[in-house]
Amino acid sequence: MSLDSRRYHITTYGCQMNKADSERMAGVLENMGYQWSENPDDANLILCNTCTIRDNAEHKVYSYLGRQAKRKHAQPDLTLVVAGCVAQQEGDALLRRVPELDLVMGPQHANRLQDLLEQVASGQQVLATEPIHIVEDITKPRRDSAVTAWVNVIYGCNERCTYCVVPNVRGVEQSRTPEAIRAEMVQLGEQGFKEVTLLGQNIDAYGRDLPGTTSEGRHQHTLTDLLYFVHDVPGIERIRFATSHPRYFTERLIQACYELPKVCEHFHIPFQSGDNDVLKAMSRGYTHEKYRRIIDNIRAIMPDASISADAIVGFPGETEEQFMNTMQLVEDIEFDLLNTAAYSPRPGTPAALWDNQLSEEVKADRLQRLNRLVGVCAELRSQRYANRIEEVLVEDQNPKDPTQVMGRTRGNRLTFFPGNIEQLRGEIIAVKVTEVRSFSLTGEPLSSVATAVR
């Protein structure tokens, strides 16, 4: 196959970590001479980056792989790669189920893609799921945006939530050094990127595995310290971080977010349940009272902070009263965004083996009731934006209206307004909000904002 004819397509399922991994693997492929194909049918290398967090995500993966496997029978030179969490969890079983696959690789092996594909080229069917130490990757990722970028700061997770498969498939926590993270951000600033989201499955655990302690006896490297360390990177106007764990969310972190003007007032802190007994069964390590205190402390010094979260309903043994405690917490806090899901038993997790599973009907009913409440609360919470002036970082053209551009406020609210994307991409614009919806805004531009200021 000539270099000119090598084309690839990546389909990504799941979380922000997967999206960041896909960008890195795309960078590896382009470094090898592959060119991106928007249409998977025109590609001769298909990479499916998978998610196993819930059962329905896994079904989507197998449906997609089934279509590509049929295609390989008609196109033998097609290279089929499965990466990510399904690959890590299923391993050999995935190769048996879809024998047309050339490479199955877990998320810890994303940086090894070139070496693994060279093994495939020698005629091998390759399985790479063994735990390894993740080395720094100097390959330039192929970023999906020209304005915003993901930067991994910690891989893996050491928590053992009884419903969650992530520690099994992403391995133990491995923090990058502050110097490596800053170097990547400096490069992004030089390339014209304006916003960085620092990523970790449990980002508040950043630095626990790095050496060193302070005179106060705490870890020398924490997320709070990292924010101070990277805050002055030239060119980067905004910094976000995700995903937080209430168990490790500190007052010191809240104060840093308040003091550092580039850090956006946007916090994604999953609570999962509003009932203490359910939280204990989940092994989450905090109470709903602690969670409420975290939100109260954030809003005490940042009243307009945007709070998003995740919640699970129908956990094994959850009673109607316990579910109503979740409903009460949602009503009390009024989240800006709440990702909801019915509990889905995952292989290899303790909760999947318990005999107090709830029926699908009960789970579906509770999810529907919660979603109705979420919609009402989001609409009420959104009203605070009416007639306000918001700083919007312009990212792209509105795909539904070419006369408009779209971007996000500091609170991560999607916002549309009239403008020319070629002139405004990457600019921070002051926008007067004229229309409020539950999860987005429309407005009129007022002026450019030179720097991100509170």
UniProtKB/Swiss-Prot annotation:
Nucleus is among the record's keywords: no
Necessary cofactors: [4Fe-4S] cluster
Cellular compartments annotated: Cytoplasm
List of residues binding [4Fe-4S] cluster 2: C157, C161, C164
Cofactor note: Binds 2 [4Fe-4S] clusters. One cluster is coordinated with 3 cysteines and an exchangeable S-adenosyl-L-methionine.
UniProt-annotated binding residues for [4Fe-4S] cluster 1: C15, C51, C85
Gene Ontology cellular component list: cytoplasm
GO annotation, biological process: tRNA methylthiolation
Domain Radical SAM core, chain residue ranges per copy: 143-384
MTTase N-terminal domain boundaries: 6-122
Enzyme nomenclature, EC number: 2.8.4.3
Catalyzed reactions per annotation: N(6)-dimethylallyladenosine(37) in tRNA + (sulfur carrier)-SH + AH2 + 2 S-adenosyl-L-methionine = 2-methylsulfanyl-N(6)-dimethylallyladenosine(37) in tRNA + (sulfur carrier)-H + 5'-deoxyadenosine + L-methionine + A + S-adenosyl-L-homocysteine + 2 H(+)
This protein's UniProt keywords: 4Fe-4S, Cytoplasm, Iron, Iron-sulfur, Metal-binding, S-adenosyl-L-methionine, Transferase, tRNA processing
Main localization (coarse): cytoplasm
Domain TRAM, chain residue ranges per copy: 383-447
GO molecular function, one term: methylthiotransferase activity
Subunit-level organization: Monomer.
Function: Catalyzes the methylthiolation of N6-(dimethylallyl)adenosine (i(6)A), leading to the formation of 2-methylthio-N6-(dimethylallyl)adenosine (ms(2)i(6)A) at position 37 in tRNAs that read codons beginning with uridine.
PANTHER family linked: CDK5 REGULATORY SUBUNIT-ASSOCIATED PROTEIN 1, MITOCHONDRIAL TRNA METHYLTHIOTRANSFERASE CDK5RAP1
Family note: Belongs to the methylthiotransferase family. MiaB subfamily.
NCBIfam families: miaB-methiolase, MiaB/RimO family radical SAM methylthiotransferase
Protein name, entry field: tRNA-2-methylthio-N(6)-dimethylallyladenosine synthase
Organism: Acaryochloris marina (strain MBIC 11017)
